[in-house]
């Protein structure tokens, strides 16, 4: 079974909070970005790689590649798995990726979204995906940075 030390939803994927604070807090040595678009975009990949400290590996995989390959991960790989949306995590969970808890970080406000926390805004599709994750036994909590208290996402919906 892969050693996923943290699963996080963050629309920005890898940036300062993830690359420095969360990687260190979780003790991760590999950041796995599960996103179909970024997996095919070397420019975005290069920008994200610059944020990570030396010695932290990074992979940019499509959702299907994560589903097909995550179980091959070595025990020594301490994986921080990051997706942009709850729907992406739902796809991974339905595909057999062992995710039990999801840290909900940054989901930006846009038209049609409702702000439920300082850094989290959701629409009907997000809520449906979160509810399906809950049904699958996945705990979801809002926590922007490790020093903030974790708040049960389902108490905010």
Swiss-Prot record:
The active site is at 15 (pros-phosphohistidine intermediate). The phosphoenolpyruvate-dependent sugar phosphotransferase system (sugar PTS), a major carbohydrate active -transport system, catalyzes the phosphorylation of incoming sugar substrates concomitantly with their translocation across the cell membrane. This system is involved in N-acetylgalactosamine transport. The EIIB domain is phosphorylated by phospho-EIIA on a cysteinyl or histidyl residue, depending on the transported sugar. Then, it transfers the phosphoryl group to the sugar substrate concomitantly with the sugar uptake processed by the EIIC domain. Pfam families: PTSIIB_sorb. It is found in: Cytoplasm. It comes from Escherichia coli (strain K12). Its EC number is 2.7.1.-. GO terms for cellular component: cytoplasm. This is N-acetylgalactosamine-specific phosphotransferase enzyme IIB component 2. The keyword Zinc does not apply.
């Amino acid at each position: 079974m892969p050693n996923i030390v943290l699963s996080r939803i963050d629309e920005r994927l890898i940036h300062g909070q993830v690359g420095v604070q969360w990687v260190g807090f979780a003790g991760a040595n590999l950041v796995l970005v599960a996103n179909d678009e970024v997996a095919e975009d070397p420019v975005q990949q290069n920008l994200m790689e610059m944020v990570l400290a030396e010695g932290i590996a990074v992979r940019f995989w499509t959702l299907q590649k994560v589903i097909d390959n995550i179980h091959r991960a070595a025990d020594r790989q301490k994986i921080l798995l990051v997706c942009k949306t709850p729907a992406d995590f739902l796809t991974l969970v339905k595909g057999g990726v062992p995710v039990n808890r999801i840290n909900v970080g940054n989901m930006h406000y846009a038209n049609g979204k409702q702000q439920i926390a300082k850094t989290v805004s959701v629409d009907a599709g997000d809520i449906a995906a979160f509810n399906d994750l809950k049904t699958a036994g996945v705990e979801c909590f809002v926590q922007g940075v490790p020093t903030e208290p974790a708040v049960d996402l389902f108490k905010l919906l």
